[in-house]
């Protein structure tokens, strides 16, 4: 088997996206209301606005029930906002699309397909030639460390391995933005740390724009370039924080004084910070 480099096959082939002045993601005055069984109106999100530039790893952090996942699902086009607009690459989101990749907290692999076939699924549906599909699948199998398990089915994989496949499958489709809804939330603490390290490494290679949802402050700082701190009922952005810690990163940074300071600041934002805006 030939050696595998950290260079994406698309970059080698010259398909790298040109830098764009417009934000990769723009959320503009988005609100989301639900009708309760009693007939009352519940406001899940209230006039949320923010932007994520190209190649940024952005994190939504907040308590349960603050609308983090709801906002991600709106961005994915799986739900519609009550008001406001969301744009990806300058195009308004009006439903699901190949320009957005999604990794869920739950395990979403097709159980009748192997690891290789799961990663290949979207490429095959788009009619990509077999040779090109093979190159891309091989690259991502190596990126997530699952080449030896390429012909296994999901029932033969651990939870962490299944989430590795989900990440590879999403990235293989080369979306404009990767949406991640607490993808490590169901994993044990040790596996979660391993997955965070893997995601850091994969992101350094792909530089894909990411919107990542978590309630874990450590995870938000470890992974993110920018953190949007949310408050609940209704869901709003309380604070926007840039992470002043250089990349590449590793788990040793949790002892860095800047990391500890940010963790303390975000903790106070979540519990007794300023009013939402």
Please provide the spans of the model-predicted regions.
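Conserved ABC ATPase "signature" region
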Residues: 120, 124, 131-149, 201
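The feature captures the beta-strand-to-loop junction immediately N-terminal to the Walker
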Residues: 61-63
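ABC-family P-loop ATPase nucleotide-binding domain
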Residues: 1-33, 275-277
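Hydrophobic anchor residue at the start of the ABC signature
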Residues: 167
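Conserved ABC transporter NBD signature motif
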Residues: 84-96
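Helix-to-loop junction immediately C-terminal to a conserved catalytic motif
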Residues: 76
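Conserved signature/switch motifs of ABC ATPase nucleotide-binding domains
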Residues: 152-155, 173
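Short coil-to-helix segment of the ABC ATPase nucleotide-binding domain corresponding to the Q-loop/switch region
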Residues: 113-121
């Amino acid at each position: 088997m030939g050696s595998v480099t950290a260079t994406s096959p698309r970059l080698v082939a010259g398909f790298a996206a040109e830098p764009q002045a417009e934000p990769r993601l723009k959320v503009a005055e988005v609100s989301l209301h639900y009708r309760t069984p009693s007939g009352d109106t519940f406001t899940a999100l209230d006039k949320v606005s923010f932007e994520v530039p190209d190649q940024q790893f952005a994190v939504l952090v907040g308590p349960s029930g603050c609308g983090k996942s709801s906002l991600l699902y709106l961005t994915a086009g799986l739900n519609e906002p009550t008001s406001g607009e969301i744009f990806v690459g300058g195009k308004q989101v009006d439903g699901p699309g190949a320009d957005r990749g999604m990794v869920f907290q739950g395990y979403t692999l097709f159980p009748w397909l192997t690891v290789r076939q799961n990663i290949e699924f979207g490429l095959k549906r788009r009619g990509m030639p077999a040779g090109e599909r093979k190159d891309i699948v091989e690259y991502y199998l190596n990126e997530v460390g699952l080449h030896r398990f390429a012909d296994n089915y999901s029932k033969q994989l651990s939870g962490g391995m299944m989430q590795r496949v989900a990440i590879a499958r999403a990235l293989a489709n080369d979306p404009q933005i990767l949406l991640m809804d607490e993808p490590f939330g169901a994993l044990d603490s040790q596996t979660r740390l391993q997955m965070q390290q893997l995601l850091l490494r994969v992101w350094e290679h792909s530089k894909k724009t990411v919107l990542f949802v978590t309630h874990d402050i450590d995870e938000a700082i470890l992974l993110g370039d920018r953190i949007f701190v949310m408050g609940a009922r209704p869901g709003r952005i309380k604070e926007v924080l840039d992470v002043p810690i250089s990349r590449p990163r590793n788990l040793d940074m949790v002892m860095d004084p800047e990391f500890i300071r940010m963790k303390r600041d975000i903790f106070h934002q979540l519990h007794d910070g300023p009013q939402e805006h």
